[in-house]
């Protein structure tokens, strides 16, 4: 469960036109730590059971496929950050490389992600709470979490940075402890030789490309947010070198954590057909390797992470809608309103809360995850194409390493991302393409048949 930091937008500064220069103080190691915090070492937990099931027990292999797509895309983000060091975002890259119209649709796809982050966080928090207290129905948990998140965001209470740091330390401890206990369990029950086994990675009798790629498309959720490193380009001492390096290394480190987790988890619970509940399978594995104590520890971790993600996700989404309403991209009277006392976009928060509640009741967790990844992969594909258009075509950097960096790498990233993107389920693609079509219709109306340039929202850094 991921979320962008909605507290980053300071409305008073935006409205007063603050143009101060940010000091460049961040090193590549600062960027790496930031990226790992954003991705979270426990990001694999909510989707493990789903990936393991749809990939026919080959979740580790699905993560390796997802890594390939992410590595080439990470390199492309690094390339684009060298050109736009003061505004690192998919929206900025696409708008400036292609056209404001394509940039608008890229931003429209990202809006889908902002809507789904708090929604899928609420769904998973409710599923986890229902495992802890099954006497309370799932739908009641959904209502309670949605209401609580809405009240906190309306009142403007923000999560403290210290609390996030402590949470990161706890989640890292949890990830290391889980892997260590899984290794111990396999060693005790199956012997040392069982720790290195092909069944944790590849099952020839169940292998099929389609399920593997579907697993990769869902596993990509564990990488969502790595591109946020590029938003720190203006704060970085050497953005042209360090952004790309840090983004690629973060993807590699995240893969190591995820693959180690799913590999040993699959050795502990080899028969994925017997998961009591697919969405919370990681809790059952935790109970097997660490008893009730680890089960409760994992449950609390997932609950806190889910609520935290929902809080920051809704804050980011409501402020994005506020920025778009303020700039006239969407109705100003409805979305461009700030509460006079709390200073928060309350109308946008109410709307996002209602949509999140309805979505959590009507939508399965897997579909929410796939839709979130649908929007993300639209951005990933476009950023890879931006590198080709900007460096290979417009700048003509085609010789030697230029051919590799500006054509082969980004086109490989775009093709792998496209393949993974198209491997999403039919329902996810249907809803995703309908969303893009709605964006195209809105853009046509808003620009009077593409005669006018689309409005550009100053809140673009949120995307």
Task: Label every model-predicted segment.
Residues 1-49, 53-58, 64, 70-75, ...:
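Membrane-interface "cap" regions at the ends of multi-pass membrane proteins
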Residues 92-93, 99, 131, 246-311, ...:
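TM-loop-TM module centered on a large, flexible mid-protein loop between adjacent transmembrane helices
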Residues 47-53, 62, 71-154, 159, ...:
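Hydrophobic transmembrane alpha-helices that form the core helical bundles
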Residues 17-22, 59-60, 137, 166-299:
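Helix-loop-helix junctions that connect adjacent transmembrane segments
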Residues 139-196, 247-251, 372-382, 409, ...:
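Membrane-interface loop-to-helix entry segments
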Residues 1-6, 92-95, 101, 121-142, ...:
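Helix-loop-helix connectors at the membrane interface of multi-pass transporters/channels
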Residues 180, 371, 375-376, 404-463:
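A generic transmembrane alpha-helix motif of multi-pass inner-membrane proteins
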Residues 47, 128, 147-154, 179, ...:
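Alpha-helical transmembrane segments of multipass membrane proteins
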């Amino acid at each position: 469960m991921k979320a962008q930091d909605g507290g980053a937008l300071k409305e008073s500064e935006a409205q007063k036109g603050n143009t101060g220069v940010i000091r460049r103080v961040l090193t590549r190691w600062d960027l790496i730590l930031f990226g790992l915090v954003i991705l979270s070492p426990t990001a694999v937990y909510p989707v493990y059971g789903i990936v393991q099931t749809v990939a026919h027990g080959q979740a580790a292999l699905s993560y390796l496929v997802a890594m390939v797509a992410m590595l080439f895309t990470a390199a492309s983000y690094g390339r684009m950050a060298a050109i736009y060091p003061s505004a690192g975002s998919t929206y900025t890259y696409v708008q400036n490389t292609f056209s404001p119209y394509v940039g608008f649709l890229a931003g429209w796809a990202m809006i889908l992600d902002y809507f789904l982050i708090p929604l899928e966080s609420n769904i998973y928090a409710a599923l986890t709470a229902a495992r802890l207290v099954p006497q309370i129905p799932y739908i009641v948990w959904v209502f309670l979490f949605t209401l609580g998140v809405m009240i906190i965001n309306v009142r403007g209470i923000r999560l403290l940075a210290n609390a996030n740091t402590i949470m990161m330390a706890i989640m890292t401890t949890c990830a290391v402890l889980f892997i260590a206990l899984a290794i111990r369990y396999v060693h005790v029950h199956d012997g040392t030789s069982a720790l290195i086994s092909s069944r944790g990675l590849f099952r020839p009798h169940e292998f099929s490309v389609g399920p593997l790629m579907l697993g990769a498309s869902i596993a990509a959720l564990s990488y969502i947010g790595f591109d946020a490193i590029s938003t720190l380009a203006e704060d970085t001492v050497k953005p042209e070198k360090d952004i790309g390096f840090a983004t690629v290394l973060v993807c590699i480190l995240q893969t190591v954590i995820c693959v180690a987790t799913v590999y040993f988890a699959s050795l502990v619970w080899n028969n994925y057909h017997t998961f009591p509940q697919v969405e919370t399978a990681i809790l059952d594995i935790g109970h097997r390797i660490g008893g009730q104590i680890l089960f409760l520890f994992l449950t609390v971790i997932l609950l806190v992470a889910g609520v935290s993600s929902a809080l920051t996700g809704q804050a980011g989404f409501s402020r994005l809608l506020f920025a778009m309403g303020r700039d006239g991209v969407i109705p100003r009277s409805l979305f461009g309103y700030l509460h006079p006392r709390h200073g928060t976009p309350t109308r946008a928060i109410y709307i996002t809360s209602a949509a999140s509640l309805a979505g959590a009741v009507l939508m399965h967790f897997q579909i929410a995850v796939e839709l979130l990844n649908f929007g993300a992969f639209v951005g990933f594909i476009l950023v890879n194409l931006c590198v080709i258009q900007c460096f290979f075509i417009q700048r003509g950097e085609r010789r030697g390493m230029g051919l590799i960096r500006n054509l082969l790498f980004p086109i490989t990233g775009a093709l792998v991302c496209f393949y993974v993107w198209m491997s999403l389920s039919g329902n996810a693609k249907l809803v995703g393409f309908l969303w893009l079509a709605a964006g195209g219709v809105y853009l046509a109306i808003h620009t009077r048949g593409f005669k006018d340039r689309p409005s550009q929202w100053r809140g673009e850094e949120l995307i």
